[in-house]
């Protein structure tokens, strides 16, 4: 999950609210100090932190809870809404024909990000192409071409041409039939006059629908200075924050967005091609606090799963065979890394107890289960009760696993079957209310 340490610290602060006998000034002061400490450790700008904490404190002490909500729930909602406000609104990026200019510092991950954003549009049913305008970095052309070929998106570049403006002009003509054209400019330092002029010249070639600045989350509060310089040069319309999954200082990049009155368009949360997500403020904070992001989960499922991948209705009726579990594991593998999928679920305090080693072990276990099920007959997968000691030995031998691992799989299936039956009695989906959020977070 992005900004793991910040999320853990914020959840700890919110538990103090939920576990307090009453909400008074002393409790509010203590919680606000915890929030301040957590945000500053994540490299969020101090002025922004002070403004946030002042707003939370003022609202918590002066506002009366609305009808049907107690004081604990009300303060929790205040913290949640103010955290959403601090990250700002998302940059609207429509699923339609458009031209996008990508700018950023050297080493920000801009070239990879350009290809991943093209992949995002392809997943949505559009036809994207990336134009390579980086004529300075050795290997930029080859890297981007290989990425685009791998991801199945269009590519245009001129390996021997050093005139970036001419390349973009030609590329826009050649790729005119593509829905989305993404121009990957050379990485630069904001104070390099010649490169800034080149960027302005490219900007003057066409009406760009978006000018997206790529920021590496790890650069911390230096992001603000860079964002202002790029904004002054071409007027950026949105920010893409990369590598949020690998740094404790992502708050600096978030501060830069607020500091320049821009907004976030995409966030990079992993290394795979599908780990570039449209930014959703509510979902981002919800995931940060361990409340999950069911909207993102449903969106990811809709993108990668076929209609018949998982028979949900049959499973909810209580009939959950090994075939169903096999389909479920296949679906999980299609949707991406387990850690990322788990971050979209409302695990509350449980999520923070799962280490990276545990995720890896669990992912390996799931792969092992699939190998075991491949060694079963269709009848055995449809009715696990058929699998006695002799069949366990046969399946273990055929899969290269131990009999204990086969028994563990059968035990896991029983647990999942029981869980599916329990879900049958659950209420309709939708956003959780504050009481459910408190329970999910391990609060009283």
From Swiss-Prot:
Top-rank taxon, per record: Archaea
Pfam families (UniProt xref): SRP54, SRP54_N, SRP_SPB
Q: List, in alphabetical order, the GO biological process terms annotated in this UniProt record.
A: SRP-dependent cotranslational protein targeting to membrane
Subcellular location(s) per record: Cytoplasm
Coarse class of the primary localization is cytoplasm
Provide GO CC annotations from the record: signal recognition particle
CDD domains the UniProt entry points to: SRP54_G (cd17875)
Which molecular-function annotations from GO does this UniProt entry contain? 7S RNA binding; ATP hydrolysis activity; GTP binding; GTPase activity
HAMAP family noted in UniProt: SRP54
What role is this protein assigned? Involved in targeting and insertion of nascent membrane proteins into the cytoplasmic membrane. Binds to the hydrophobic signal sequence of the ribosome-nascent chain (RNC) as it emerges from the ribosomes. The SRP-RNC complex is then targeted to the cytoplasmic membrane where it interacts with the SRP receptor FtsY.
Family in the record: Belongs to the GTP-binding SRP family. SRP54 subfamily.
Q: Mind telling me what this protein is named?
A: Signal recognition particle 54 kDa protein
């Amino acid at each position: 999950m992005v900004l793991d340490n910040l999320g853990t610290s914020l959840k700890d602060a919110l538990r103090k609210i939920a576990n307090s006998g009453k909400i008074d000034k002393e409790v509010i002061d203590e919680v606000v100090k915890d929030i301040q400490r957590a945000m500053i450790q994540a490299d969020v700008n101090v002025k922004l932190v002070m403004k946030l904490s002042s707003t939370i404190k003022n609202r918590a002490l002066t506002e009366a809870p609305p009808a049907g909500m107690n004081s604990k729930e009300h303060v929790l909602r205040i913290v949640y809404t103010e955290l959403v406000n601090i990250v700002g609104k998302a940059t609207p990026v429509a699923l339609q024909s458009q031209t996008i200019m990508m700018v950023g510092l050297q080493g920000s991950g801009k070239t990879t990000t350009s290809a991943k954003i093209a992949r995002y549009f392809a997943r949505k049913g559009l036809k994207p192409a990336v134009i390579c305008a980086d004529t300075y970095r050795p290997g930029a052309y080859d890297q981007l071409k290989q990425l685009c070929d791998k991801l199945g998106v269009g590519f245009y570049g001129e390996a021997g041409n050093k005139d970036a403006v001419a390349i973009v002009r030609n590329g826009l003509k050649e790729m005119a039939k593509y829905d989305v054209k993404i121009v990957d400019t050379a990485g630069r330092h904001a104070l390099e006059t010649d490169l800034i002029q080149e960027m302005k010249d490219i900007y003057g070639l066409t009406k760009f629908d978006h000018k997206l600045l790529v920021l590496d989350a790890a650069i911390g509060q230096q992001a603000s200075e860079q964002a202002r310089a790029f904004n002054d040069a071409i007027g950026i319309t949105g920010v893409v924050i990369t590598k949020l999954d690998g740094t404790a200082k992502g708050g600096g990049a978030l501060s830069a967005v607020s500091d320049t009155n821009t907004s976030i368009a995409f966030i990079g949360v992993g290394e795979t091609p599908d780990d570039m997500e449209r930014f959703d403020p509510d979902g981002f904070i919800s995931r940060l606090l361990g409340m999950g992001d069911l909207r993102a989960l449903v969106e990811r499922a809709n993108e990668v799963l076929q209609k018949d991948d998982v028979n949900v209705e049959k499973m909810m009726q209580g009939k959950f065979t090994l075939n169903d579990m096999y389909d479920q594991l296949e679906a999980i593998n299609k949707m991406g890394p387990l850690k990322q999928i788990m971050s979209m679920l409302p695990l509350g305090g449980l999520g923070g107890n799962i280490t990276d080693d545990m995720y890896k072990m669990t992912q390996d276990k799931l792969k092992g289960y699939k190998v075991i099920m491949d060694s079963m007959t269709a009848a055995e997968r449809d009715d696990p009760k058929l699998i006695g000691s002799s069949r366990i030995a046969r399946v273990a031998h055929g899969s290269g696993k131990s009999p204990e691992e086969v028994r563990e799989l059968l035990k896991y299936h029983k647990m999942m079957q029981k869980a599916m039956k329990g879900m049958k009695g659950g209420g309709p989906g939708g956003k959780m209310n504050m009481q459910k959020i408190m329970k999910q977070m391990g609060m009283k």
